[in-house]
Amino acid sequence: RTARTLKSVGINVNFAPVVDVNSNPANPVIGKLERSYSADPEMVATHARIVSAVHKEHGIVTTFKHFPGHGSAWNDSHVGMADVTTTWADSELIPYRRAIEANELDAIMTAHIFNANFDKDHPGTLSKRVLTGMLREELGFEGVIYSDDMQMKAVADFYGLRSEERR
């Protein structure tokens, strides 16, 4: 029904589905708001691929988010830093892997999460190691990469646009 409604009003891109694995039910922006399909990454992958397929039937591009995974965070990146260095698991990539392997993923949206195991200096959205190394080279994704809102506090308060322009 969502895809049909979006098409009827002229929308052709949906920044959905959320493919974050519900690995932390207390996560203030994923778990507590029930934005995840499941704590089981395979279930998340299956549901997301179904949602994406239905959207495509209606001519709507979907955007899997939030890469590389926001489900294990204890904090909301809208209001501050969300460090997943000790909580993130490789299983959070499964929904992306399954869609990429099946050539069904058009676009992803980045997560402003910080993980020192990926990049000691930058959150996912600003990390070449995450976006080029992990997403493009390791996972083989060739589609569109969207940033989440750059005014979210996890980026704006720590990696403001002016400081990034100087790098």
Regions found by a protein language model. Give the residues of each.
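Active-site-adjacent structural elements in enzyme catalytic domains
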Residues: 1-10
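Active-site-proximal loop motif in hydrolases
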Residues: 6, 36-43
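Surface-exposed, active-site-proximal loop segments in enzymatic domains
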Residues: 26-36, 76-79
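Active-site core segment of subtilase-fold serine proteases
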Residues: 1, 23-25, 43
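Short glycine-enriched loops at secondary-structure junctions
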Residues: 12-24, 64-70
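Second-shell residues forming the walls of enzyme active-site clefts
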Residues: 42-167
